[in-house]
């Protein structure tokens, strides 16, 4: 028996470790460093119906224990991804989770209806932190009713399981999670980045051209752990946890808090080998802590 194996809707993971969307592209660059078959899954870069150039530069800034980014969902568009990016990933056994973004509900529906055409795509990750241009630019994921409606619309057309990525920039993440689960989501991924800003002391202006950016990295891990713990208390659907993962102990902390699998984001930029390192270190650390399997952690959680 594979003690690291995880079974969640659409995904048979050989281990619980995967790179997070936006930190791994479509895998081609990282495939030069190691065999992508080592990974539990791959969360691919966000896809929108049409190509997007993204935000003006500068759009990345370092912070203490993290980084800010405002890339603006730069991507080559659905047709290009289906024709050129996903075929490369089809050579690997590793399941692909396609991240889908949009400016309108129709954008999401359009991409989700077709992204499953690739045999590599086993699940969708719905990025609901995008601004809804038809409703004043408020992010889809900040209103329970809007999040419920979008999830339901996507579930009606998707051919693979749908995981919804939760934004931490809300007053009550539990109510958002409950609305999404009620709409039929197969799982949740959490958390997305926290909204932040840095100021250039010489120009007296924000360093990032867009003004604000998403804060990621070790600084946000305690927030992610807290939110996963809160959501797990009211939700039974799978959670893929993320937010500041650096070490194998971080991985186990996320799993104990309530996650079923863990995604690694910002650390891929610091160490491109981080995912395979964590995968290789996990069994030894489990032995040291007396954990026989990941299923054991799940049972412990249920009894808390």
UniProtKB/Swiss-Prot annotation:
Q: Provide a Gene Ontology MF annotation, just one.
A: dihydroorotate dehydrogenase (NAD+) activity
GO CC list: cytoplasm
Residues the record marks as active site: 130
- Keyword Cytoplasm in the entry? The reply is yes
Q: Name one GO biological process term.
A: 'de novo' UMP biosynthetic process
Q: Which UniProt keywords apply?
A: Cytoplasm, Flavoprotein, FMN, NAD, Oxidoreductase, Pyrimidine biosynthesis
Give the E.C. number(s).
1.3.1.14
| Main subcellular localisation | cytoplasm
Q: Where do the annotations place substrate binding?
A: 45, 69-73, 127, 192-193
Q: Where does FMN bind?
A: 21, 45-46, 99, 127, 165, 191, 217, 243-244, 265-266
- Which cofactor does the UniProt annotation name? FMN
**Keyword Ribosomal protein belongs to the record:** no
CDD domains attached to this UniProt entry: DHOD_1B_like
Q: Which reaction is the catalytic activity of this chain?
A: (S)-dihydroorotate + NAD(+) = orotate + NADH + H(+)
* Localization terms from the record: Cytoplasm
The entry assigns this protein to a family as follows:
Belongs to the dihydroorotate dehydrogenase family. Type 1 subfamily.
Q: Cite the record's note on assembly.
A: Heterotetramer of 2 PyrK and 2 PyrD type B subunits.
The identity of this protein, by name, is Dihydroorotate dehydrogenase B (NAD(+)), catalytic subunit
Q: Which organism is it from?
A: Listeria monocytogenes serotype 4a (strain HCC23)
- What taxonomic classification does the UniProt entry list for its organism? Bacteria, Bacillati, Bacillota, Bacilli, Bacillales
Q: Which gene encodes it?
A: pyrD
